């Protein structure tokens, strides 16, 4: 009944998520920014909006500037970067989303962003994650969707909280929910949903908490999991 993504509602909403809802004729809620924003696919109705506090975002951006990190700022339906570089080009190639380069203005934004995405070299990833958590303890929640992506959200914001909020809105119990994922930012859903499903190419820690593992995403794992549940072809362990 809903679509959950870590990316934003700008180009992703128009190119990757909304077309499926339109094709099916369903005004389903679209969960984006790791749960920070939930909007109706067709109506645009806002169910959840939990951006980072502006001062927290500005402090994070100053940290990014001082440490020479690459950052992406998700604000409204736009994605902003300081300048185009290998990271922005890589992200555009993977996601199909073209960022808007705004130079030094990125460090002095005037609007609270939905999410910040910090990219590092893989070998610096763990150390950077730890440093951000220590310096901004209690002010930001950190997760990741790839080995060099640090995703920074308002405390308490995650995919499960967004799904849970929607479920309560529709009168659905947690045990009646199935969530499918592959990365660290999916763990909150996998752990708490009645049926947490990991695709075969999911991170080991995601598979560890999943109640079932389906085929990889390249082998229609999501479709197979849904079909199996709907046709009661599997027994979900307690």
Feature annotation, model-predicted:
Residues 15-24:
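Metal-dependent catalytic neighborhoods of phosphoester/phosphodiester hydrolases
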Residues 59, 63, 67-189:
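Conserved acidic, metal-coordinating active-site core of Asp-based
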Residues 151-238:
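Mg2+-dependent phosphoryl-transfer enzymes with acidic/Ser/Thr/Gly-rich catalytic loops
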Residues 9, 27, 113-114, 193, ...:
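Short, well-ordered alpha-helix to beta-strand connector turns
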Residues 23-27, 47-50, 87-92, 159-161, ...:
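Short, hinge-like loop/turn segments at secondary-structure boundaries
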Residues 2-13:
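Single conserved hydrophobic/aromatic residue that forms the stacking wall/gate
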Residues 29-31:
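Short, small/acidic-rich helices and loops at N termini and domain boundaries
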Residues 40-58:
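Glycine/small-residue-rich loop that forms an oxyanion/phosphate-binding "nest" at active or ligand-binding sites
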């Amino acid at each position: 009944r809903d679509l959950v993504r870590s990316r934003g509602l700008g180009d992703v909403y128009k190119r990757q998520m909304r077309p499926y809802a339109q094709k099916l004729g369903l005004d389903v809620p679209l969960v984006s920014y790791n749960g920070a924003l939930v909007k109706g696919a067709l109506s645009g109705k806002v169910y959840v909006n939990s951006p980072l506090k502006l001062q927290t975002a500005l402090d994070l951006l100053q940290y990014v500037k001082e440490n020479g990190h690459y950052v992406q700022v998700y604000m409204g339906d736009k994605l902003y970067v300081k300048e185009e570089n290998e990271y922005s080009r890589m992200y555009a190639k993977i996601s199909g989303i073209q960022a808007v380069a705004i130079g030094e203005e990125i460090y002095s934004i005037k609007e609270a962003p939905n999410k910040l995405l910090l990219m590092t070299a893989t070998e610096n990833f763990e150390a950077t994650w730890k440093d951000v958590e220590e310096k901004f303890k209690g002010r930001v929640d950190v997760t990741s969707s790839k080995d060099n992506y640090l995703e920074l959200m308002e405390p308490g914001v995650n995919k499960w909280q967004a799904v849970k909020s929607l479920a309560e809105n529709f009168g659905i119990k947690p045990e009646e929910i199935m969530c499918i994922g592959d990365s660290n930012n999916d763990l909150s859903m996998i752990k708490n949903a009645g049926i947490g499903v990991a695709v075969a190419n999911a991170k080991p820690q995601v598979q560890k908490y999943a109640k079932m593992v389906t085929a990889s995403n390249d082998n229609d794992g999501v479709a197979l999991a849904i079909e199996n549940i709907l046709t009661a072809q599997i027994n979900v362990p307690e």
